[in-house]
C-alpha cells in the first residue's frame, strides 16, 4: 500500500495514518511496562544447610534480587523455599554462583517479560470498561474497579452502600462497599484485598465475592442467611496507590507510595505498619526494603483510615479477613509470636472446615495454622492488630499458587481460585453465625 500521494502536503497528512495502520498490524512491537523485564528470571532454591542459607542471603543482597518468597531475606534459612526475581544483568552471576557452590535450584520463569505478556490480556483491545458485561475473569485496573463499585452502588442500592473512609498518600479515595440487607443492629465481617500491590488475585477475589453475593442472594439459602444477618465491609483495593503503580510502572511493586524525607526509596509495607509489636521481628527499619515498617505505626494514610474505621466499629465487627498471595495458606494469629490464642479451638475449627471446603472443589490443598509457625514470624500485621483490638475471628488467606506462576497467576486461574475461596469464606462466615460469639 502506498501512503505517499502526488503532493508533499498530502503525503504529510497521510503519514500518521500509515504509522497507525502499521502499529495495528504489528501489535507485538510494543511491550508491557516498556519491556523492562526482558530476560529476567525467577529462580527457586531451598538451602540444605545454614551455611548455604548464609551464602544465598549474601549473594542475594549483593545482586539486589527482588524476593518473591519469603518476603524478606532475613527469613531465608535451612529448608526455606526461596523464590527470587533476578534482573537479566544479574541472572548470569547468580546461576554461576549456584552452580559453583553446588546448590540445587530450579528456574521457575525463564523470561519474565514473555511470561507476563503471555499470561495477561493487558495489551489486548478487549472492552474492559463495559459495566453491563463486567468480566470477573480478568484483572482490572484501579479505575475500572472503582467505576464498577460506583455502578453497583447505583444498581443494587437494596444490598449495597458505597462510601469512602479517607484518602491515600497520593490523594485517591479509599472506597468501601457495605454489603447486606439493611438493618440496625447486625454483626459484621471486614474483608480487604490488595494490601500488597503486586498480589492482583486479591482484588479479583473481592470483586468475585461481591458478584456471587448479589447473584445468589435469592437462590442460595446460605448466602441469604449471611446477608440477612451480617454486614460485609469490603475493600477491594486497600493499597490504591501501589496497585495503580503496579499497572502503570512496576508490575511487582509491593509497598505503598509514600515518600521518605531521607531516602529516595518510596513506600511502606502496609502489612508491617500496624500498632502491634510494630517494627519487631520480620519487619525492616530501612525504607528501601520491601518489609519497611514505616517511620511510626499507622504512618500510612491507608492504614490509618482502616484502623480508625475498625476501631469505631469493633463492637460489631466479629471477623477480619485479608487476602494475599501466594502460598496456598489460611493463617490466623499470632504472626508476631509463637503462642496460642485464647479462642484457638473455635478459630482452628473454622480454618479446618474452610480448607476442606476449598479442597472439595478442585482438590487444591491449603495449609492452615498460626501465621508464625505456618509461614513465618512478622510484626505489625493487620491480622494481629484486628485480633488484638477485639475482633475474635482474624484470618489471612494466601491464595494460589505455590510458586509456579507466583505473582503472575494467569487470568484463566481467576475463576477456579475465586470459586474455591468463596466456599472457604462462606464456611468461615457460617461457622461464625452458628458457633462462635
Curated annotation (Swiss-Prot):
List of catalytic residues: 398 (proton donor/acceptor)
Residues annotated as binding Zn(2+): 196, 199, 324
Alphabetical list of Gene3D superfamilies matching this protein: Metallocarboxypeptidase-like (3.30.70.340), Zn peptidases (3.40.630.10)
SMART domains, sorted: Zn_pept
GO biological process: proteolysis
Cellular component GO terms held in the UniProt record: extracellular space
Outcome of substituting residue 270 to V: In FEB11; affects protein secretion presumably by altering protein folding or stability
Propeptide section residues: 31-129
Signal sequence segment: 1-30
Names of the cofactor(s): Zn(2+)
Disulfide feature: 265-288
EC numbers for this chain: 3.4.17.-
Main subcellular location: secreted
Keywords: Carboxypeptidase, Chromosomal rearrangement, Cleavage on pair of basic residues, Disease variant, Disulfide bond, Epilepsy, Extracellular matrix, Glycoprotein, Hydrolase, Metal-binding, Metalloprotease, Protease, Secreted, Signal, Zinc, Zymogen
Domain Peptidase M14: 138-432
Protein name per Swiss-Prot or TrEMBL: Carboxypeptidase A6
Source lineage: Eukaryota, Metazoa, Chordata, Craniata, Vertebrata
